[in-house]
């Protein structure tokens, strides 16, 4: 009789374990979340330039995930399988040996037009299931933004919440001695990269705000000691006056 009770109980445990494996997720509603071990393999390339872009993309993705506090990227030196191909399944056993719960890998290739194509995959290592597969085509200079977009896709798939890596920060940068401070409108990626100044510091600037499209910035500047509202186009660098205040 005891055996009849033990077997159903064991079956229930196995089913529960199978269910957990089928959906690898990070529950961010808990008070404390242990970072998920994840392997971010260098993206392969079809020439030296694309291979370098692939390494750079993987490094940015790993840094983004680690900075979120929800992921623990595994050191590349521990990887058993290297140069993971998109045309074949990963060797999941190799990744389980280093306790990687998830695997990110991809490839970078140049097209005849000069554009760069970036493909990536996200795998649940223990369930041996693909979780995300996407491809992006853009100019080579946009590789960092592609890395942020991929990071967002991984974050959303693993947590169910929208990612925030493909965002920019606009702020007022101050410099100079305390009695002659220079204030300039500045912008950068959320990780501090691609920093640039948008104004020259000749006029006092305050209260920058992104437009709903995130392509323009409104801000207040004192021109000849009179407040004036400007709108600045991030892509073109052009600005125009929206209004003056007496």
Identify the role of each PLM range.
Residues 5-17:
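Bacterial N-terminal signal peptides
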Residues 24, 86-153:
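Amphipathic beta-strand/beta-sheet edge segments enriched in Tyr/Trp
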Residues 29-91, 104-110:
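Short beta-strand->alpha-helix linker/helix-N-cap micro-motif
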Residues 113-117, 178-186, 225-231:
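Structural motif
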Residues 126, 189-193, 233-237:
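Short loop/turn segments that connect beta-strands within beta-propeller blades
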Residues 143, 153, 157-160, 202-220, ...:
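Conserved beta-propeller blade repeats
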Residues 170-179, 217-224, 243:
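Beta-strand C-termini and the immediately following turn/loop, strongest in propeller blades
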